Every structure is written in C-alpha cells, then in structure tokens.
C-alpha cells in the first residue's frame, strides 16, 4: 500500500489516497480514495487490517480497514493529528505520536482593558519559529508525545510527557510490552 498524492485545482488543496500494488508491480488500484485525504498506512501484523490516518470524519483521526471485506472503522477521537502509527506485534494496540499543547509564558503583562473601551485584537506573541506548512498562521507551542490506543478503538493513553519532542518511528518489543523511540 502506498500514498498517492494529487492536487485539486478547484479547491487549491492537496489530496492523498491509499493505493495498493501487487508484489510484481503490475496491478495498481485504489484501496481507500475519495474527496478527503488518507496517509500513514500501516499493515497489522497478521496482514488482515490496515491502519491509517484520514480526515474523513472532519479532523485527522485513526481508521482501521479490514482488507477482506473493505469495511473501515474510525477508532479514535483525538484533539490533534496523529502520526508515526505502529502496530504492536500481537495486533492489539496502535502506538502513535501526537502534539500536546504546551503552556506559553508571556514576555509582557498586558494592560487591563478599560470598561467600555473598544480595542483591536490582542497581539500574538511568537516565542518559537514554527509556522503552519500551508503558510496560514503560527503553530501553537506544543510537544510531540507517544500515545497508545486499542486497535479496536477506545481512549488513547499518553505514555510520555515533558518539554521535548518524540519524532520518527516507533518500534515495539516482540512481547508487545515496550515501545522504543528516540527523543
């Protein structure tokens, strides 16, 4: 399975869909496509399911698709966009990383607005140089942490914390009890 990207000239957006290719490279066909986008496909250890991230539900969420019947289930209700999906070897869990908003310290104390005054919007204080990839604004201060969620759906559980980021791949121990990552 691979991600096939295209540009929607009418909506000025990039779209990505999941396509499947045979092992000899001859047969390319859409596995999960539509007007929304899908990314980060990961096969379950038994090869019967595929986890991926899609915005079909309105925001970036984790979905699982059963390859034999084509059914797809939304398994998460996350506040931020997940990435770096990784199946546990027993197929019961999915690990992923996700941003957790950080508290930002103000460098100046704002004045109190007098009653009845009509002021402009408060200024945005930028303490980091993280901008949205689409150029539409500033990314709020956040740190990327490791989470797990049951592969059949449920509540996500945060495993790491602190003022540092976890980027890159996540790897499970063979007994599905530990996750290895770099911070």
Predicted stretch roles:
Residues 14-17, 99-147:
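Predominantly five- to eight-bladed beta-propeller fold
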Residues 22-26, 66-70, 150-154:
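Short loop/turn segments that connect beta-strands within beta-propeller blades
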Residues 6-10, 56-59, 101-104:
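Short glycine/acidic-enriched loop and turn motifs that connect beta-strands
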Residues 18-20, 62-64, 146-148:
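Hydrophobic beta-strand positions in blades of beta-propellers and related beta-sheet-rich domains
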Residues 1-3, 33-53, 71-72, 79-97, ...:
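Conserved beta-propeller blade repeats
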Residues 1-18, 141, 170:
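Beta-strand-rich domains and repeat architectures in extracellular enzymes and scaffolds
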Residues 19, 23, 27-29, 33:
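N-terminal accessory segment at the very beginning of proteins
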């Amino acid at each position: 399975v691979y991600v096939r990207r295209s540009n929607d000239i009418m909506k000025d957006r990039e779209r990505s869909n999941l396509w499947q290719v045979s092992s000899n490279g001859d047969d390319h066909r859409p596995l999960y496509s539509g007007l929304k986008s899908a990314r980060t496909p990961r096969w379950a250890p038994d090869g019967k399911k595929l986890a991926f991230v899609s915005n079909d539900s309105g925001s970036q969420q984790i979905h699982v698709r059963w390859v034999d019947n084509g059914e797809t289930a939304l398994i998460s209700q996350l506040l931020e966009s997940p990435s770096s999906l990784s199946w546990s070897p027993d197929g019961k869990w999915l690990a992923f990383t996700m941003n957790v908003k950080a508290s930002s310290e103000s460098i100046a104390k704002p004045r109190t607005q007098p009653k009845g005054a009509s002021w402009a919007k408060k200024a945005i204080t930028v303490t980091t140089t993280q901008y949205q990839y689409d150029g539409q604004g500033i990314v709020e201060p956040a740190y990327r942490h490791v989470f797990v969620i049951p592969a059949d759906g449920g509540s996500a559980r945060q495993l790491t914390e602190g003022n540092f980021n976890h980027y890159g791949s996540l790897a499970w121990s063979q007994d599905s009890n530990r996750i290895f990552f770099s911070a």
